[in-house]
Amino acid sequence: MKFPASVLASVFLFVAETTAALSLSSTYRSGGDRMWQALTLLFSLLPCALVQLTLFFVHRDLSRDRPLVLLLHLLQLGPLFRCFEVFCIYFQSGNNEEPYVSITKKRQMPKNGLSEEIEKEVGQAEGKLITHRSAFSRASVIQAFLGSAPQLTLQLYISVMQQDVTVGRSLLMTISLLSIVYGALRCNILAIKIKYDEYEVKVKPLAYVCIFLWRSFEIATRVVVLVLFTSVLKTWVVVIILINFFSFFLYPWILFWCSGSPFPENIEKALSRVGTTIVLCFLTLLYTGINMFCWSAVQLKIDSPDLISKSHNWYQLLVYYMIRFIENAILLLLWYLFKTDIYMYVCAPLLVLQLLIGYCTAILFMLVFYQFFHPCKKLFSSSVSEGFQRWLRCFCWACRQQKPCEPIGKEDLQSSRDRDETPSSSKTSPEPGQFLNAEDLCSA
């Protein structure tokens, strides 16, 4: 049975960030910064409440009549109790004999073109641990993108405007960044396990390292770009946020309405139509919060029973990173044009170049992950390198087609006249089947 390290990491980040935020808010209060104190508490306590609801909802404690657990969740101590419960189950699992064992069937990754199906016995203790890991993974994603991401942006903005980084603020920013990266990592692992549910997925340590570097560069550069733009154009940042928010929030619903599918009723039997709508709106809000800072790795599909699209769409991935790179470049350009005196001692061109290179580095680590370290790369129809080679061939063919014709000189005119004077019988006209199509040119 696997050691519940993911549960321990989630609880540690949750407690550390909440403690650091409460301590920093008291510092703001003593300094008279009421607005910074209110925003710091908001971005700390709101995700705490959402995490409690998530853990309570996943374990279905309302139907199990557990008033003590409900009280602990109301006191914001639910994650600590759940972590204690997880380790009690883990350490007692080897002492008691399992009275009931379920059998799961998973397929191995193909080896030499063959894939075997393996049966595995799952006891009650291991099943409970799997449920706890799943609940804490979802809670980590909620904590990261509905709490840590706004918190990091706020504290970095305060540091830029005050031109000072205190110990408490730097500690909170560090913990918030780790929480966001960890949440994005859990989101990647969840996406892989959902899309390849019938396979036994094993993620190697190097894959975790690659995802960590990919998400670290992507999220850090995105937050810095937003803070720089906000510091010089405070009004226009509201427009940017609203455009991003409504674009990602309405996109799944537009696809759902265009599909003509009936309203989903099988999310939870105990939920009414209003409750189902609230849950779907919350999931869409979480999906929007993730995509505002990084690639979500999962595509919300409301008309699907799993609410998640299991198909990996490379086209959406490419479009997202192209649009995000262009948006970051435009925001940095506007910051460079309207920067104020607080950036007097900052080399603006070098900073812009570093941020753009940092975002490209994130994309590079993403490509490395999908090329070498993805646990299900054997199931891909084509690898990243093969797709890049095909794109390069087509690009070279397009450049050849657009190459301008050379100017015709006197010798060319004279040779054309000589050809016109030759008998028509000597002229050869190409047959229709002798022309190369675009695919042949691309493969040449």
UniProtKB/Swiss-Prot annotation:
One matching Pfam family: XK-related
Membrane-spanning ranges: 3-23, 38-58, 69-89, 141-161, 172-192, 209-229, 236-256, 278-298, 318-338, 350-370
Subcellular location: Endoplasmic reticulum membrane
Basic and acidic residues composition bias: residue spans: 408-422
Coiled-coil region(s): none
Cytoplasmic side: 1-2, 59-68, 162-171, 230-235, 299-317, 371-444
Organism domain of life: Eukaryota
Keywords from the UniProt entry: Amino-acid transport, Disulfide bond, Endoplasmic reticulum, Membrane, Phosphoprotein, Transmembrane, Transmembrane helix, Transport
Side Extracellular, residues: 24-37, 90-140, 193-208, 257-277, 339-349
Disordered: annotated segments: 408-444
Membrane topology reported for the UniProt record: Multi-pass membrane protein
Biased composition (Low complexity): 423-432
Official protein name in the record: Endoplasmic reticulum membrane adapter protein XK
Organism of derivation: Pan troglodytes
